[in-house]
C-alpha cells in the first residue's frame, strides 16, 4: 500500500514529494479508528510551522483533509462503528498520510459525513469551512447587517467565507485579482455588494470600501496577506495586496481585522489609529484547533456545523475535477507553490 510523503532539503525551502510503501497496520490503540480513504483534499504544507513545532521528520506524511469509511475501531471508541461514513482533518503529527488507501486516526479528529454529501465535497470543504467559521464566528463575531470585506474572494477559501457571511445576513464586499475572478464573484448568489477589481493596480481598496459604506468603514476585514512596506520594497507576488495602512483606514469603529499575515508589524501610529477606532486585530491560524486539545469539543462542533452547512447547500465549494492518486505528486507540487485557484481533491 503506497502513501505520499514529502522530504525537505536541509539547505533551502525546496520540498520533494515521494510515494513510499506503507504497512497496513491494524488498530491497536484504544481510541483510534481505521478508515478506508475515499477522498483527500490537497492543501499547502506550512513547513515553517512544522519546524517551529519541532515536528520535522525525514519523510513527512502528505494530505490531511480526508473522507472515508470506518473499517475497524479501537476498544474505547464511542463515536463510531464499522461502516460509518466520516470526514475530518488529520492532526499535524499524524503518522499516516491522508493520501493513502487506509489510515489510522484518533476518533476525536473525525465527524460523521451526511449521506447526501459526496466524498470529494466533504474532503474539499472541511478545511476552508473551519477557517471561515474561525474567522467569522470566533475572531470577529459576525452578525446580521454587518459589512464584511473578504480579500481575494474568488479563491477556494474566499468563496466559502463569502457564502458563510451571506448566510448570516452580512453585506459582503470582495476584491478580484483578475477578470476571471471578477466574473466568478459577480455570478455568486446572493450577489456581492461590490466587487473591487485590483488587477490593474489603479483602484484604491480603502476608497471603494468607504464609498460603499457611506464613509463609515467596514465592520470586518479578512485579508489574504498584506503589504508592510512600499511597493518598491516588496516582491512582485505581493504587489496586488493592500498596504496595512489601507486596511486600517477602511476599518469602521469597533471593527475587526482578521489577518493571515503572520509577520504583521504595526508601528505606534498604526496602533494609535486602531486604538481611536476601538478596533481589534486577530490572527487567523486554523491549525490552533489541532495544536491544542483545550477546546476539542468546540472544534468538533465546528466540523459538524461545516458538514451541516454543506449538506444544506449553504456551502458550495470551488472544486477542481477530482484526480486519481497517481497524479497527486504532480498536483501537490503545484499546490505547494500556491499556483492553484480551485480546491484539488484526490478521489480513491
Swiss-Prot record:
Which GO CC annotations does the UniProt entry carry?
early endosome
Q: Which UniProt keywords apply?
A: Endosome, NADP, Oxidoreductase
Its top-level enzyme class, in one word, is oxidoreductase
Q: Does the keyword NADP apply?
A: yes
Compartments, record wording: Early endosome
What is annotated about its quaternary structure and interactions?
A: Component of the FERRY complex composed of five subunits, TBCK, PPP1R21, FERRY3, CRYZL1 and GATD1 with a ratio of 1:2:1:2:4, respectively.
**Family indicated by similarity:** Belongs to the zinc-containing alcohol dehydrogenase family. Quinone oxidoreductase subfamily.
Physiological role: Component of the FERRY complex (Five-subunit Endosomal Rab5 and RNA/ribosome intermediary). The FERRY complex directly interacts with mRNAs and RAB5A, and functions as a RAB5A effector involved in the localization and the distribution of specific mRNAs most likely by mediating their endosomal transport. The complex recruits mRNAs and ribosomes to early endosomes through direct mRNA-interaction.
User: By what name is this protein known?
Assistant: Quinone oxidoreductase-like protein 1
Species this chain originates from: Mus musculus
Amino acid at each position: 500500500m503506497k502513501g505520499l510523503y514529502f522530504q525537505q532539503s536541509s539547505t533551502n525551502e525546496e520540498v520533494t514529494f515521494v510515494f513510499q510503501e506503507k504497512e497496513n497496520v491494524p488498530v491497536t490503540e484504544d481510541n483510534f479508528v481505521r478508515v478506508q480513504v475515499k477522498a483527500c483534499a490537497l492543501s499547502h504544507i506550512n513547513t515553517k510551522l512544522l519546524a517551529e513545532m519541532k515536528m520535522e521528520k525525514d519523510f513527512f506524511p502528505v494530505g490531511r483533509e480526508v473522507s472515508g469509511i470506518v473499517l475497524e475501531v479501537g476498544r474505547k471508541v464511542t463515536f463510531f462503528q464499522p461502516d460509518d461514513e466520516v470526514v475530518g482533518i488529520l492532526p499535524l503529527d499524524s503518522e499516516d498520510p491522508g493520501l493513502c488507501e487506509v489510515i489510522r486516526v484518533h476518533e476525536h479528529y473525525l465527524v460523521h459525513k451526511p449521506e447526501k454529501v459526496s466524498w470529494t465535497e466533504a474532503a474539499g470543504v472541511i478545511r476552508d469551512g473551519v477557517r471561515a467559521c474561525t474567522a467569522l464566528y470566533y475572531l470577529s463575531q459576525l452578525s446580521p447587517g454587518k459589512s464584511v470585506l473578504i480579500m481575494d474572494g474568488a479563491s477556494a477559501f474566499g468563496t466559502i467565507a463569502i457564502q458563510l457571511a451571506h448566510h448570516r445576513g452580512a453585506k459582503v464586499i470582495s476584491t478580484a485579482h483578475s477578470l476571471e475572478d471578477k466574473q466568478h464573484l459577480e455570478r455568486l448568489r446572493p450577489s456581492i455588494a461590490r466587487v473591487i477589481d485590483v488587477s490593474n493596480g489603479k483602484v484604491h481598496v480603502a476608497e471603494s470600501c468607504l464609498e460603499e459604506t457611506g464613509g463609515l468603514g467596514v465592520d470586518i476585514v479578512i485579508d489574504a496577506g498584506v503589504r508592510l512596506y512600499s511597493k518598491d520594497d516588496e516582491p512582485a507576488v505581493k504587489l496586488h495586496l493592500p498596504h496595512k495602512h489601507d486596511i486600517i483606514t477602511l476599518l469602521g469603529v469597533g471593527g475587526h481585522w482578521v489577518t493571515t499575515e503572520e509577520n504583521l508589524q504595526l508601528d505606534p501610529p498604526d496602533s494609535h489609529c486602531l486604538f481611536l477606532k476601538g478596533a481589534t486585530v486577530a490572527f487567523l491560524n486554523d491549525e490552533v484547533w489541532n495544536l491544542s486539545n483545550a477546546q476539542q469539543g468546540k472544534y468538533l462542533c465546528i466540523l459538524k456545523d461545516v458538514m451541516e452547512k454543506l449538506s444544506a447547500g449553504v456551502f458550495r465549494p470551488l472544486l477542481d475535477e477530482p484526480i486519481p492518486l497517481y497524479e497527486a505528486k504532480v498536483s501537490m507540487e503545484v499546490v505547494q507553490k500556491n499556483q492553484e485557484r480551485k480546491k484539488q481533491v484526490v478521489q480513491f
